[in-house]
């Protein structure tokens, strides 16, 4: 075998590829994140976690939106201030069941205003937990 000839039919020399395609490195060796300091898109996760929905409930039929939003992993600020007493009680009972079923959290913000949070959501600075709060 002569010098510079391919070893087998699959081996080719640089001269044979010359002019066919330009090879451009995508990143330098030091541009790749290290395993220790790398987190996959932390900004996107943080941005998603900052979002919450305010739902002002007037009729019991609106309670379904509370459940669907919380099931999607989005915190809900449940405002029952404009609902009649019996409707507010039914919606609160329903929402409590949803929170329990999803292992979520419920926090009282004000009279007839509650923050419903998906599991794993940290909440700071609220008045008290909704558990044991007398009345609606």
From Swiss-Prot:
The keyword Cytoplasm belongs to this UniProt entry's keyword annotation: yes
One GO biological process term: FtsZ-dependent cytokinesis
Keyword Cytoplasm: yes
Cited Pfam families: SepF (PF04472)
Gene Ontology CC terms, in alphabetical order: cytoplasm
Localization in the cell: Cytoplasm
InterPro entries: Cell_div_SepF, Cell_div_SepF/SepF-rel, SepF-like_sf
Alphabetical UniProt keywords: Cell cycle, Cell division, Cytoplasm, Septation
Function: Cell division protein that is part of the divisome complex and is recruited early to the Z-ring. Probably stimulates Z-ring formation, perhaps through the cross-linking of FtsZ protofilaments. Its function overlaps with FtsA.
Description of how the protein assembles with itself and partners: Homodimer. Interacts with FtsZ.
Family the entry assigns: Belongs to the SepF family.
Protein name: Cell division protein SepF 3
Species this chain originates from: Streptomyces coelicolor (strain ATCC BAA-471 / A3(2) / M145)
């Amino acid at each position: 075998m002569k010098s510079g000839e391919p070893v087998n039919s699959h081996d080719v020399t640089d001269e044979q590829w010359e002019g066919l395609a330009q090879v451009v490195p995508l990143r330098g060796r030091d541009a790749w994140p290290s395993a220790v300091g790398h987190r996959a898109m932390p900004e996107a996760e943080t941005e998603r976690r900052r979002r919450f929905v305010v739902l002002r409930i007037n009729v019991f039929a609106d309670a379904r939106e509370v459940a669907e939003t919380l099931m999607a992993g989005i915190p809900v600020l449940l405002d029952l201030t404009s609902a009649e007493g019996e409707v507010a009680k039914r919606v609160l009972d329903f929402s409590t069941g949803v929170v329990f079923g999803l292992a979520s959290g419920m926090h009282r913000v004000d009279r007839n205003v509650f923050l419903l949070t998906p599991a794993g959501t940290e909440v700071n600075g609220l008045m008290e937990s909704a558990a044991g709060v007398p009345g609606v």
